[in-house]
Amino acid sequence: MADAWKDLASGTVGGAAQLVVGHPFDTIKVKLQSQPTPAPGQLPRYTGAIDAVKQTVASEGTKGLYKGMGAPLATVAAFNAVLFTVRGQMEGLLRSEAGVPLTISQQFVAGAGAGFAVSFLACPTELIKCRLQAQGALAGASTTSSVVAAVKYGGPMDVARHVLRSEGGARGLFKGLFPTFAREVPGNATMFAAYEAFKRFLAGGSDTSSLGQGSLIMAGGVAGASFWGIVYPTDVVKSVLQVDDYKNPRYTGSMDAFRKILKSEGVKGLYKGFGPAMARSVPANAACFLAYEMTRSSLG
């Protein structure tokens, strides 16, 4: 139980560090993912990541890059407590004897279990965040574009109240749960396995206790990049479902969204916002893992 509390505290600190560093990149990613497909002959609202940054800062100021941070900030303790605590508990179940490091394949399984558990928190949190981040990109969409364009949200609680009142109650907050599973389970499995594998590569063996902060930063960056490298299309599907109009939906489900994106935009449509996501993943996850390791070490 003592280890669980240490994982909880360390995960909370790591998650806060990740959020502060990575949220502006995430805002741009969601804006690019959720902007409506332009009519033939017209340009999209944002021509790329840099253009999205310029337009966001011009219309909303720098604070626009941090729009929607209240939702993940309010739940960062619970989110990372679940992620790192479940991972720690699964490590205990998988470990053959006390003090023996897990194999990389066992780290993969532990990460998958943590990803499954955290999906139940990630889905409603990210639905709220995506609605807030995307409303600027959707504001110019026509009422026939089947996106949530008319609703203007005042903040995270306003989104939650609207969904609970007008979109099927609590079930509405879990819109996009399937693609959230499809992202979090393989993504976290790969991320934790890659993190441990790279640490062992740098240490030259399974004892990684002597690694310095620079090595932990590199390992965290590699881990973050590996997460997005394998699951990014599922994140695009999740985002478009979560900002889709409840009354006049464009998509009937995850597979329908996948097929329609592929048909209308090609494979590149499944990688909208990939640049900002990868640019975010390296520093944000480096900050997360470094903060986690330092806090965990200080707790003994």
Curated annotation (Swiss-Prot):
Pfam families, sorted: Mito_carr
PROSITE patterns: SOLCAR
Tagged with keyword Ribonucleoprotein: no
Major subcellular location class: mitochondrion
Tissue: High expression in cotyledons, leaves, flowers and developing siliques. Lower expression in roots and maturing siliques. Not detected in meristematic tissues.
Keywords: Membrane, Mitochondrion, Mitochondrion inner membrane, Repeat, Transmembrane, Transmembrane helix, Transport
A GO BP entry: mitochondrial transport
Effect of gene knockout: Chlorotic leaves and impaired growth when grown under ambient air, but normal growth under CO(2)-enriched air.
Gene Ontology cellular-component terms listed: chloroplast; mitochondrial inner membrane; mitochondrion; plastid
Solcar repeat positions: 2-93, 102-201, 211-298
Locations listed in the record: Mitochondrion inner membrane
Membrane-spanning residues: 8-28, 64-84, 108-128, 176-195, 211-231, 273-292
Induction annotation: Up-regulated by light and down-regulated by norflurazon and lincomycin. Low expression in the dark.
Bilayer topology: Multi-pass membrane protein
Function: Involved in photorespiratory metabolism. Acts probably as a carrier for a glycine decarboxylase (GDC) cofactor or, alternatively, may act as a mitochondrial glycine shuttle. Involved in the transition from the embryonic stage to the juvenile autotrophic stage.
Protein family according to the UniProt entry: Belongs to the mitochondrial carrier (TC 2.A.29) family.
Protein name according to UniProt: Mitochondrial carnitine/acylcarnitine carrier-like protein
Organism: Arabidopsis thaliana (Mouse-ear cress)
